[in-house]
Swiss-Prot record:
Pfam families: OTOS (PF15182). InterPro entries: Otospiralin. May be essential for the survival of the neurosensory epithelium of the inner ear. One of its GO terms (cellular component) is extracellular region. Ear specific. It comes from the Eukaryota. Belongs to the otospiralin family. This is Otospiralin. Disulfide bonds: none annotated. GO terms for biological process: sensory perception of sound. Residues 1-21 form the signal peptide. It comes from Mus musculus.
């Protein structure tokens, strides 16, 4: 009885390994939209005052989030992962 169970277990392992089952890669959804550009209603000096305040508090993750929001309004915003609309000079 044990030999039969071991034989079926070995056969199952030998046949299961070469099957080569791989997970299907997930395709990107063509209907997804890029993230919306965040809104920064304050001035540049307000931004730097907030940076200095957060530095005194040691709140560096908040500085990164705020900087991402602030700099998304400039042409380099597309490098931050935001779609920046074309702006005429």
């Amino acid at each position: 009885m044990q030999a039969c169970v071991l034989w079926w277990l070995a056969l199952g392992m030998l046949l299961g390994i070469p099957a080569g089952a791989k997970p299907m890669p997930e395709e990107a959804d063509p209907h997804t939209q890029p993230p919306a550009m965040p809104y920064w209603p304050f001035s540049t000096s307000d931004f730097w005052n907030y940076v200095q305040y957060f530095q005194t508090q040691g709140a560096y993750p908040q500085i990164e989030d705020m900087a991402r929001t602030f700099f998304a309004h400039f042409p380099l915003g597309s490098t931050l992962g935001f779609h920046v609309p074309y702006q005429e000079d």
